[in-house]
Amino acid sequence: MSKNNAVEFRHVSFTYPDTEKPVLNDINFKIRSGSWTALIGHNGSGKSTISKLTNGLLLPDADANSKIIVSGITLNSKTVWNVREKVGIVFQNPDNQFVGATVGDDVAFGLENRGVPRNEMIRIVNRVLSDVGMLDYINAEPANLSGGQKQRVAIAGILAVEPDIIILDESTSMLDPNGRNQILKIIRQLMIDKNLTIISITHDIDEASLADDVIVLNDGKILAQSGPIDIFSKPELLQEIGLDIPFVEKVILKLKETGIKVPQSIKTQDELEQYLCQLNSKK
């Protein structure tokens, strides 16, 4: 595996017990280190199965040609714990991840399991809570937090154990638009500051448009893998499998039809509005 790849799947299939049809069927892909990759597809397409395979929560169907490589480690029954140290998952419902009586206790849980000395543990907990803007809540009870605050704490708990890869498994789907945008901004900044690899499992097409790369799944196979501009410039491809294109991409396509070219660097609605205002002011 190239040093530039954080995750690589080679000829990976997976079939759940008591079912005949594989949920993943001979898939191959690579995810670049330090990048943000979004996995999109309808329910049952295999997105969450990929996240569990990447973390070693599941092992692929037995096949001599099948291989999963994570942070340079080939995943198997002997290396699964090494792989899990490299990958952290933030799930859809943060309540299912909380184990501590306070925010600080919860973030410290993974460090306690690794035998980190108390003074070092306190330093790490304070640092990661500061990273996600939750240090003021260190003594708060998780049950009293908002959904967005709970997800920030869940992210801090993952950051504390310093993984190479963070998987967001539908982790913004239960948040309101403001909470979702705040979480995505935090993740993007952490990715840059700490050179993390982010894998986003999402139904939210607008969230996927913010990624560096997009993998489109359909019925256990990879339909396409490319940058978001390329993927979302083919609306018919997504519509065939019941997906839409992001609102911003819809507007950009309409502008293109009228002869207005929008820079490829523009991904968000705010950036598009700012560009159009600048364009209008030049007239």
UniProtKB/Swiss-Prot annotation:
Pfam families xref list: ABC_tran
Where would I find the ABC transporter domain in this sequence? 7-244
| SUPFAM superfamilies, alphabetized | P-loop containing nucleoside triphosphate hydrolases
Name a single GO cellular component.
Answer: ATP-binding cassette (ABC) transporter complex
Q: How does it sit in the membrane?
A: Peripheral membrane protein
Which GO terms of the molecular function aspect are on file?
ATP binding; ATP hydrolysis activity; ATPase-coupled transmembrane transporter activity
Q: Where in the cell is it found?
A: Cell membrane
UniProt-listed Enzyme Commission number(s): 7.-.-.-
Source organism, top-level taxon: Bacteria
Any coiled-coil ranges, and where? none
Which positions bind ATP?
Answer: G41, H42, N43, G44, S45, G46, K47, S48
What is the annotated quaternary arrangement, including any partners?
Answer: Forms a stable energy-coupling factor (ECF) transporter complex composed of 2 membrane-embedded substrate-binding proteins (S component), 2 ATP-binding proteins (A component) and 2 transmembrane proteins (T component).
Instruction: Summarize the protein's role.
Output: ATP-binding (A) component of a common energy-coupling factor (ECF) ABC-transporter complex. Unlike classic ABC transporters this ECF transporter provides the energy necessary to transport a number of different substrates.
**Protein family membership:** Belongs to the ABC transporter superfamily. Energy-coupling factor EcfA family.
Q: What is this protein called?
A: Energy-coupling factor transporter ATP-binding protein EcfA1
**Gene name linked to the record:** ecfA1
